[in-house]
Amino acid sequence: MAMASAMDLSSPPTFFLSGTSTSSPSLRRLSSISVSGFRRHSNRKLQILCQATAGTEPQSGLSVSGSKLAARSGQDRLLKVPISNIRNFSIIAHIDHGKSTLADKLLQVTGTVQNRDMKEQFLDNMDLERERGITIKLQAARMRYVYEDTPFCLNLIDTPGHVDFSYEVSRSLAACEGALLVVDASQGVEAQTLANVYLALENNLEIIPVLNKIDLPGAEPEKVLREIEEVIGLDCSKAIFCSAKEGIGITEILDAIVQRIPAPLDTAGKPLRALIFDSYYDPYRGVIVYFRVIDGKVKKGDRIFFMASGKDYFADEVGVLSPNQIQVDELYAGEVGYIAASVRSVADARVGDTITHYSRKAESSLPGYEEATPMVFCGLFPVDADQFPDLRDALEKLQLNDAALKFEPETSSAMGFGFRCGFLGLLHMEIVQERLEREYNLNLITTAPSVVYRVNSVNGDTTLCSNPSRLPDPGQRKSVEEPYVKIELLTPKDYIGALMELAQERRGEFKEMKYIAENRASILYELPLAEMVGDFFDQLKSRTKGYASMEYSVIGYRESDLIKLDILINAEMVEPLSTIVHRDKAYSVGRALTQKLKELIPRQMFKVPIQACIGSKVIASEALSAIRKDVLAKCYGGDISRKKKLLKKQAAGKKRMKAIGRVDVPQEAFMAVLKLEREVL
């Protein structure tokens, strides 16, 4: 293949096919198509691009015209533009629907990130995010895009998609005027997509439907469009078909952001009000706060005031995220950026708080601020007791970045010193545990997760209890309440029965079921949060072969018949194995735990009873038989009275040993039983 030696870049160049290449009539007809209609793959084949309904040419290996667009858009990103030319938007998507890939492509096409610096999941900084394919810590990026010769500033505020971080998502959406609703064209609407769309609608955002992965063989875009219209109620007549991986439809998305998402209100003359949507701890500069200016303006050197925490600081540095931090002189209404003010604790600059000027305070803070409330608790103990100080230091460092993480010291007779930790949900708990083990080289034992119970005492007091060992005695408590959640399950119709059976097993209360498509149903249940902190999600995926998805939200506390189940080994209570269960499940849980302990505890010289008790009542029991020592082996006959004397002496010794003997439960047994507790609860 030969190309013209001199190319005039002002007009699109053309390919000239050699004589050996024109044997095919179809190739001869294409011999004068411009280079912008082709993309050269690594295997050196040329592919014709469909530019009709599927969108623009791929931008993955940017063509000549695409490179010029990126250069024009990416240059001078820091130049000020009128407020009418600012667009703040977010991307809403279920896990694995292509949110991070689309964000990467937007950064690349607008020239925000150069090709040489580009990598997959560019905005996902943590290794854990890349491995799991999820967004944990949200990011923001400022892009410059030229539309009809007019420069626009596009602020992408990335969001975590998981339900554990729904509060952070709501604050991110509150900082935007619009959102891209990204749905996989081969999978359709999923549960967490619905949850975040409802949050966007509550914030009155302009939603642009985007159907991703249209290049997949199993893509059914028309069917998914109908699903979006029926389930969510959005008008999909202007939905955009795209493939973030192949770069199809990216320009259409950028144009739609400019055309359809409204500009921020021009309120630069009002007192400063800025919404914090994220923060993290920098060891050299203190807490770096990401915020959106709603009213007024802020510049370096201003004395700022955090309205929820009541703390004030001087702004040492103000800048924008593009996506790296770049200092600017000031930020005004509608803009998104960061501020460094030598804040020493993330707790002083919480997500959802309002920043204002110390000397000219705003009359009211921005609505929607909430304190992060842990919903799931578990104990973390180092396998090596010498690592306790390291665990404390690691938790303190993590807490600098994660204000939702709570912990307090805890002591166990079996596992030594550790911490009782509170988390937003199960994913949050898994992420913290994995980061402790990976980033701080700690080897940890995790107790069975529990939720926060509300205990009403006979004297009228109400206390919160997350640790079974702190549950008051039955005579002192009037009632116990547990948190309930509303859970929505989206599943193919073939697995409806399996999911309903699972929910009924977990004390679920059926509310409604509706078909959102010909072969997909939405099932609504209310069930205790405690029933979800075990293996509920694993069972959900297992029983539906991975096709079902779920979304849940806490709806409050309800009174339940809850009891404390204790495990006694040789009449001694083992506190770490105590748990709070519903009375109806006490026997099955107790039986499973005692049987597992019988398998794992080494046999002793005396008989060891293993009991599951409610108060003083034993509901399940197993016995570990004694190792028999043959004391008659040395007797080669003789009088029977001699043998009786030896046997009697042995029995007395075993009785004394049983009274004073101590049974040590090995570490492996603890870990296996704690894992079993997570499965059976």
UniProtKB/Swiss-Prot annotation:
Catalytic activity: GTP + H2O = GDP + phosphate + H(+)
This protein's UniProt keywords: Chloroplast, GTP-binding, Hydrolase, Nucleotide-binding, Plastid, Protein biosynthesis, Transit peptide
Any one cellular-component term (Gene Ontology): plasma membrane
Database matches in InterPro entries: EF-4, EFG_III/V, EFG_V-like, EFTu-like_2, G_TR_CS, GUFP, LepA_C_sf, LepA_CTD
A GO MF label: protein domain specific binding
SMART domains: EFG_C
Coiled-coil regions, chain positions: none
Annotated Gene3D superfamilies: 3.30.70.240, Elongation factor 4, C-terminal domain (3.30.70.2570), Elongation Factor G (Translational Gtpase), domain 3 (3.30.70.870), P-loop containing nucleotide triphosphate hydrolases (3.40.50.300), Translation factors (2.40.30.10)
Keyword Secreted: no
Stretches assigned to the tr-type G domain: 84-265
Transit peptide: 1-51
GO BP field: positive regulation of translation; translation
Positions of GTP binding: 93-100, 158-162, 212-215
Enzyme's top EC category: hydrolase
Domain of life: Eukaryota
Annotated localization: Plastid, Chloroplast
Enzyme Commission number, as recorded: 3.6.5.-
Family, similarity comment: Belongs to the TRAFAC class translation factor GTPase superfamily. Classic translation factor GTPase family. LepA subfamily.
Function: Promotes chloroplast protein synthesis. May act as a fidelity factor of the translation reaction, by catalyzing a one-codon backward translocation of tRNAs on improperly translocated ribosomes.
HAMAP family on file: GUFP, LepA
Protein name (record): Translation factor GUF1 homolog, chloroplastic
